Swiss-Prot record:
It is an enzyme of class 3 (hydrolase). Signal peptide: none annotated. SUPFAM superfamilies: Ribonuclease H-like. This is Crossover junction endodeoxyribonuclease RuvC. Pfam families: RuvC. It comes from Zymomonas mobilis subsp. mobilis (strain ATCC 31821 / ZM4 / CP4). The keyword DNA-binding applies. One of its GO terms (biological process) is DNA recombination. The keyword ATP-binding does not apply. Mg(2+) 1 binds at D7, D139. Its main location: cytoplasm. Mg(2+) 2 binds at E67.
């Protein structure tokens, strides 16, 4: 099964695709979509949508997940991040995918073992869980971590459903 993870941002959106067979994870591809800050906001959002649509068409994921947005003290930045996240959610929904959403601390805990992990720890564990992966950057590593988290949660939910049906 192919999982796509997204770490949305207006300046840089990370994406990562993995395949899961049983309990084995394999890297398919990862990348970062960048938009030019000198462009109009609407144009940047349109470019983000087009790039995400191309990633989805290219890798044909069956499951997808997006990292939730954390607010910060700059309301304008938080709003723009929310708009980029909306484009990510829309792009996945447009492709007919159901979408998991995870708080960054949940992703860190699932991949590193602690919700307070830093970016370098996340990158190191993603590299360990997906041997041979060449990370396109920190946002791509975060996106792969989101995909891994969703794969774990999906496997747990499937196992639970099987146990409930068997009882």
């Amino acid at each position: 099964m192919i999982f796509l993870g997204l770490d949305p941002g207006l300046g840089t959106t990370g994406w990562g695709a993995i395949t899961v067979e049983g309990n084995r994870l394999s890297h398919i591809a990862n990348g970062q979509i960048r938009t030019d800050p000198s462009m109009a906001l609407a144009r940047r959002l349109a470019l983000l949508h087009d790039a995400l649509a191309a990633v989805i068409a290219s890798h044909q994921p069956e499951m997808a997940a997006v990292e939730e947005v954390l607010g910060n003290s700059n309301a304008q930045s938080t709003l723009k991040l929310g708009q980029a996240r909306g484009i990510a959610l829309f792009s996945l929904a447009e492709a007919g995918l159901s979408v998991g959403e995870y708080h960054p601390n949940v992703v860190k805990k699932a991949v590193v073992g602690t919700g307070s992990a830093d970016k370098k720890q996340v990158q190191a564990m993603v590299s360990r869980l997906l041997p041979g992966v060449k990370l396109a950057g920190p946002d791509a590593a975060d996106a792969l971590a989101v995909a891994i988290t969703h794969a774990h949660h999906h496997a747990s939910a499937r196992g639970y459903a099987r146990r409930v049906r068997a009882s």
